[in-house]
Amino acid sequence: MTQQVPLIIKLGGALLETEGALTSFIGGIQRFLQQFPRPLVLVHGGGCLVDDLLKALGKTSTKKNGLRVTPADQIPYVVGALAGTANKQMMAEAIAQGLNPVGLSLADGGLCDVTQLDPEFGNV
């Protein structure tokens, strides 16, 4: 039996804040998979959700060269926004459109082995 290489798509967080965009995108994915069945991995952003949550909590969000600088005390909020809110919004839409998603974060199941590239960016 031959395994298919999964199609990997990286989504920007703007997809989650633009009305109707996620519904439209997932609908397109569903139609694509009907015609071309294969494993699919969606990697999502959610910086807008992180920014909104930090602002609501009275915390500042600092960026350096367009990348978020994340102090240790903000990690629970960043994880909540990305692995919680963003992930579950995408899963709910996929389920509503008849797909069978599994939501994971990079911390699940030893999926990633990471090395900090620059300590100036904090804990992400």
Language model regions located:
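Nucleotide/pyrophosphate-binding catalytic subdomain
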Residues: 1-124
